[in-house]
Curated annotation (Swiss-Prot):
It is a multi-pass membrane protein. Keywords: Cell membrane, Membrane, Transmembrane, Transmembrane helix. SUPFAM superfamilies: Cysteine proteinases. The lineage of its organism: Bacteria, Bacillati, Bacillota, Bacilli, Bacillales. This is Uncharacterized protein YebA. It holds the Pfam family TgpA_N.
C-alpha cells in the first residue's frame, strides 16, 4: 500500500515503523519462556523485513513472493534436512499442508504438525504487520494495540514463569513515545498544516523528558509490597481447582526442560505397553548442559540413519558382559510423539510400519527420518532387541577418576557446569567423594547421600527456584524435597563437580505389571505417571552405567561381584540382590514420576506430531484464538467490501420513517472508509457535488437533495426513501477508488 505525500516525512515514517516493530517484538520475546516455541529469531527477522518492505513502498508482486520465500526457507531450515534446492521437500510440505487443512476442517486442532503451525504463525505475523501499518500510518493511532500489549505482558508475568519487569518498562517507553508523536501527526493531518523541524523538535524534546522522567520516577520511587501478591490460588478456588497449586502441571513427557521445578498432577493416560522378560528403563533422550535452572542440549548434533534398524553400540565397551533381550512395544494410538522408547543397549529396532529411523548423535533420540516425521503420529508397534549389561563390580572399582577431562575419550560436555553454580555445591561434592579412591565408590557415595533420610520424595509441595537461585543448590541445601528431576539433576551436578563425567537421561520406567503374557514375557503398561529421569555415568573402558538416585526407585542395572558366577548371557547368573529388587518392583508399583509437560513448540529442530497430553487443551484454545484473530483482522481490513452488502440487506426492504436517515448515514461512513470523508467546512450539498464531480456522476447530489427534503422540510421520509433507494444502493455498492 503506497504512502500518500501527506502521510509524513520518510524519517518520521521510519521512526514509526521502528517503534511498531519493537512493540510487536515484545509479543515474541516471552514465547520461549512459557511455551516450547524455539527459534523465535526467525519470526523477529520476518516482521522486521516485512516492515522494511512496507517502508520502501514495495508493490505486492515484490512483497508477497519475498515473504513466501522467507517463510519456506525458514520452515526448511527448521524442519527438513538436505539441500533447499532439492524441491522434493516442497512436495512433502505441501502434502502436510493439505493434510492439516483437512484436520482443521474436521476440528482436530491437536493433530496439526509443528511445520504447519509455524506456517500459520508466519501468516498471523504478516497480518499483524499490515494491521500495525494501517493503524500507525493511516489511522495515526496505537492506543488499542499498546493496551493489548500491556495486558498481554502483565498476564504472562502473573500466570507464567516469564519475568516482565523490564518488558513493561520497554513497552511503556515505546508506547508513550508513539502516543505523543502520533497525536502530533493527527493534529497536522486534521489542520492540514506543515510544521518546521524546529516545531517538531519542540514537541519531541518535552515529550522525551516527560516520558523518561515519569519512567525514572516510577523505578526510583519506594514501593509497598503487593496487597494481592498471587491471585492464582484465589482464581483456582473460585473455579473449584484449588487443589492444584500455581505453577502445577500434569505429569508426562515434555520436549524441553529449561526450567524445572514446581508441583504436578497425576495423569494415568496410557503411553505404551510392552512385553519382555526383564524390567528395564525406556530411554527417550539425554541432555548434557545444565543451566542452573534445568537442562538443554547446546548442540543439536547430527542425526544418522539406522541401516535396517541397526543401532551403533554407543554405550558399552566390548569387555562388558551382556544378555540379549527382546521387548515388544505397542504405543497407545493417542500418544502424540513419534520418538521411540528403548532400553539402553539397543541393537536392532524393527518397526511394524514401513518407516526409516534416525538417531541423533548427541541426544540419542531415535525417531523417523525428517522426510517421514510429519506423516507419523507415533511409532505404533515395534520390536527392540537389546543387550542388557551385567557389570562386574571389581572391574568398575578399578576405574580411577581422571585428573582432567582431557583424559577422557569424549568432549568435556559431560563435565559442563554453569559459572553461576554456588561454590557450596562443589564443596559438598568433594566432601562426599574424598574418602574413596575409585570412581564407582565415589558415585555410590553420592547416590547413597541422596537416598538418605536427609531428603524426601515429594510431588506436591515442590518449589520453583527464583531468578537468583540455582535449581540444584535450592534442592540440596534449602528444600531437600522433590521428585526425580531434583534427585537426578543433583546427582549429575555433584558428580561433575567431583570430576566424574555424567549425563541426565529422561524417559519412562518399566511401568506396572498388567498380565502374564506368553513365552515372550510378561506384559506391562506404562502411563504418563511413569515418566522419569535418571543418571548415566561414564566409566572408561566400561561405558555408560545407569544409576538411580531418586528415593523409592530401583536401579534396573545388574551388578555382579567377583565371587558371583560370570553372568555372560545366562540370566540365571544375575545377582541375587538384583533379582530380589525386581520381585519387589512387581509387588510395589513404582512411585509416579514426571517430566513437566510444557506447551508444544511452534518450531523444533526435529518435528513430531502434536501430542494430546496436558497441553493439548491449551494448544486447541490457542489455535482457535489464532483463527479467530486472523478472521477478525481480515474482516476489519476488508470491511469496506462486506459492510455495504450487510447495509443493503438490512435497509433495502425497510420503509419506515427512519430508514432513509440510517441509510444516508451508512453511506457517509462507507465513503469515509474509502478515503472520501466529509470536511467540517462542507455542507451536505457541497460534499455531494464534490463526490459527483470527482467521479462524473449525479447520483450523490440527487440522493442528497431528497435527504435534505426529508431532513429540513419534514417531507415524508418513507416515500422519499422508496424513490431514492436505487440511487443509494448504487452508491454504497460502488467500488470507489
Amino acid at each position: 500500500m503506497p504512502h500518500d505525500d501527506h502521510k509524513g516525512s520518510r524519517l518520521s515514517l521510519l521512526l514509526f515503523y521502528f517503534l511498531a516493530f519493537l512493540l510487536l517484538w515484545e509479543w515474541l520475546r516471552p514465547l520461549d519462556s512459557f511455551t516450547e516455541t524455539k527459534h523465535t529469531g526467525f519470526f523477529s527477522v520476518f516482521i522486521g523485513l516485512t516492515f522494511l518492505l512496507t517502508f520502501f513502498r514495495m508493490r505486492w508482486f515484490v512483497t508477497v513472493p519475498f515473504c513466501v520465500i522467507f517463510t519456506l526457507i525458514s520452515i526448511h531450515i527448521l524442519f527438513y534436512q538436505g539441500s533447499i534446492f532439492d524441491l522434493s521437500w516442497v512436495s512433502s510440505f505441501l502434502q502436510d499442508v493439505y493434510l492439516n487443512i483437512t484436520l482443521i476442517q474436521s476440528g482436530q486442532w491437536n493433530d496439526m504438525i509443528p511445520s504447519f503451525r509455524t506456517l500459520l504463525f508466519f501468516v498471523l505475523l504478516w497480518l499483524l504487520v499490515y494491521l500495525l501499518h494501517y493503524w500507525v500510518i493511516y489511522q495515526r493511532r496505537i492506543l488499542f494495540f499498546f493496551l493489548m500489549t500491556v495486558a498481554y505482558i502483565t498476564i504472562l508475568d502473573t500466570f507464567t514463569p516469564y519475568d516482565a519487569t523490564f518488558a513493561v518498562i520497554r513497552i511503556v517507553l515505546i508506547g508513550f513515545f508513539m502516543l505523543g508523536l502520533l497525536y502530533l501527526e493527527r493534529i497536522k493531518l486534521m489542520e492540514r498544516i506543515t510544521l518546521p523541524k524546529t516545531s517538531v523538535l519542540k514537541w519531541f524534546l518535552p515529550l522525551s523528558v516527560l516520558v523518561l522522567a515519569a519512567t525514572g520516577f516510577g523505578l526510583a520511587a519506594p514501593k509497598s509490597e503487593p496487597a494481592w501478591p498471587d491471585p492464582v490460588p484465589f482464581l483456582k478456588k473460585i473455579t473449584h481447582q484449588d487443589r492444584v497449586s500455581a505453577g502445577e502441571s500434569k505429569i508426562g513427557y515434555g520436549n524441553h526442560d529449561e526450567s524445572l521445578g514446581g508441583p504436578f498432577q497425576q495423569d494415568a493416560t496410557p503411553v505404551f505397553t510392552w512385553q519382555g522378560k526383564e524390567r528395564t528403563y525406556f530411554r527417550v533422550e539425554t541432555k548434557d548442559t545444565y543451566t542452573g535452572k534445568g537442562w538443554i542440549e547446546t548442540d543439536t548434533g547430527m542425526s544418522y540413519q539406522l541401516s535396517n534398524g541397526k543401532v551403533e553400540n554407543l554405550w558399552f565397551d566390548h569387555k562388558v558382559a551382556t544378555e540379549r533381550r527382546t521387548v515388544r512395544v505397542k504405543v497407545d494410538k493417542h500418544y502424540g510423539y513419534n520418538h521411540l522408547m528403548y532400553p539402553i543397549g539397543a541393537e536392532t529396532i524393527q518397526p511394524k510400519q514401513a518407516v526409516s529411523l534416525e538417531m541423533n548423535g548427541n541426544t540419542e533420540q531415535i525417531s523417523p527420518i525428517s522426510e517421514q516425521a510429519g506423516e507419523i503420529r507415533n511409532m505404533g508397534n515395534y520390536t527392540v532387541t537389546y543387550n542388557s549389561p551385567v557389570y562386574k563390580l571389581d572391574e568398575l572399582r578399578k576405574v580411577k577418576v581422571r585428573k582432567n577431562s582431557e583424559e577422557y575419550t569424549f568432549s568435556d560436555r559431560y563435565m559442563q557446569l554453569p559459572d553461576s553454580l554456588p561454590e557450596r555445591v562443589r564443596t559438598l561434592a568433594i566432601k562426599l567423594t574424598q574418602d574413596h579412591d575409585n570412581m564407582f565408590d565415589k558415585v555410590k557415595a553420592v547416590e547413597d547421600y541422596l537416598g538418605s533420610n536427609a531428603f524426601t520424595y515429594e510431588t506436591e509441595n515442590v518449589t520453583i527456584p527464583k531468578n537468583d537461585e540455582d535449581y540444584v543448590d535450592q534442592f540440596l541445601f534449602e528444600t531437600k524435597m522433590g521428585y526425580c528431576d531434583n534427585f537426578s539433576s543433583a546427582m549429575v551436578v555433584l558428580l561433575r563437580s567431583a570430576g566424574i563425567p555424567a549425563r541426565w537421561v529422561k524417559g519412562y520406567t518399566s511401568g506396572e505389571y498388567k498380565e502374564a503374557g506368553n513365552k515372550n514375557g510378561s506384559i506391562y503398561e506404562v502411563t504418563n505417571n511413569n515418566a522419569h529421569s535418571w543418571v548415566e555415568v561414564y566409566f572408561p573402558e566400561q561405558g555408560w552405567v545407569t544409576f538411580e538416585p531418586t528415593k523409592g526407585f530401583t536401579n534396573p542395572a545388574q551388578f555382579t561381584s567377583s565371587d558371583t558366577k560370570d553372568s555372560g548371557s545366562d540370566s540365571s547368573s544375575s545377582p541375587k540382590k538384583a533379582k530380589e529388587k525386581q520381585k519387589e518392583e512387581k509387588k510395589q508399583p513404582q512411585k509416579e514420576e514426571k517430566q513437566k509437560e510444557k506447551r508444544e513448540p511452534a518450531v523444533s529442530k526435529k518435528p513430531s506430531a502434536s501430542h494430546t497430553n496436558a497441553g493439548a487443551g491449551l494448544y486447541a484454545a490457542l489455535a482457535v484464538l489464532a483463527v479467530l484473530l486472523v478472521a477478525a483482522v481480515l474482516l476489519y481490513v476488508f470491511r469496506s467490501l462486506w459492510i455495504p452488502v450487510f447495509a443493503v440487506r438490512k435497509l433495502k426492504r425497510r420503509s419506515d420513517q427512519h430508514a432513509f436517515f440510517e441509510a444516508y448515514g451508512a453511506l457517509l461512513k462507507q465513503l469515509k472508509r474509502k478515503g472520501l470523508p466529509k470536511r467540517d467546512s462542507e455542507t451536505l450539498r457541497d460534499y455531494a457535488k464534490r463526490i459527483d464531480e470527482k467521479y462524473d456522476i449525479e447520483d450523490m447530489s440527487k440522493l442528497t437533495l431528497s435527504y435534505e427534503r426529508a431532513l429540513y422540510r419534514n417531507e415524508d421520509s418513507s416515500a422519499l426513501w422508496n424513490d431514492s433507494r436505487e440511487l443509494w444502493e448504487n452508491l454504497i455498492k460502488r467500488r470507489w477508488s
